[in-house]
A protein has these predicted regions:
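Membrane helical hairpin/interfacial module
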Residues: 45-54, 58-113
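Low-complexity, Ser/Thr/Pro/Gly-enriched N-terminal "stalk/linker" regions
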Residues: 1-45, 92-94
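Soluble non-cytosolic domains of exported or imported proteins
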Residues: 2, 6, 10-13, 47-54, ...
Length: 194
């Protein structure tokens, strides 16, 4: 790269393109992985990453500001994403770690990890709240998008993830295994986002 600006352009465009061109088709969200050879031995090409989608959504805002796409294109994609998320599996308002893209149904991350994932959902919601702030004073489509995000945000039952009246949030809850993963959010790690 000739200079830092070229490097920054390259990094931002590449990040944006993963979410724009590489997105799962039904949802517009980030795929868990993309194999450039299009060979998926585990048949997981349609798996959506909830936390990774949060990072990708933030990248869409950068893409609008950098004129990689226009605002109308960005709002259309973000509306598609939010509409999909409103219909996808949620567990007390919280999405699972992974979703099966075409159906919006949970794709278990592990044996007992087939329900709500509070930390991954927090990565997603952090970016959705950035989108909300970005569009809340815009045109009617943008205001409608902000209102939909408010519904999703207010639907997240953080108090449920206290496992009763415990004074801590828990990472996972499963409709099949309840609180068996028993992972309280504590320490200096990715759970601080929650």
């Amino acid at each position: 790269f000739a200079n830092d600006d070229e490097l920054l352009d390259y990094i931002q465009k590449t990040h944006f393109n993963y979410m724009w061109e590489g997105a799962e088709k039904t949802s517009g969200l980030a795929c868990e992985r993309i194999h450039l050879d299009n060979v998926y031995p585990q048949q997981d090409q349609d798996v959506i990453t909830i936390g990774g989608s949060g990072f990708g959504i933030a990248g869409l805002l950068v893409a609008i500001e950098r004129n990689f796409i226009n605002r109308e294109e960005g709002v259309a994609r973000l509306t598609k994403i939010v509409d999909y998320l409103a219909k996808a599996d949620r567990f007390h308002g919280v999405w699972p770690h992974w979703l099966h893209g075409p159906t919006g149904k949970v794709k278990p991350f592990g044996t007992k990890d087939d329900g709500g994932d509070l930390v991954e959902s927090s990565f997603l919601m952090q970016s959705l709240l950035c989108v909300r702030q970005y569009v809340k004073d815009g045109n009617e489509k943008e205001k409608a998008l902000a209102a939909k995000i408010d519904e999703l945000w207010h639907g997240m039952e953080f108090d449920w993830y206290r496992n009763g009246d415990q004074n801590v949030l828990y990472w996972h809850w499963s409709p099949n295994y309840g609180w068996e993963m028993n992972f309280p959010l504590e320490g200096y790690n990715e759970c601080l986002i929650t």
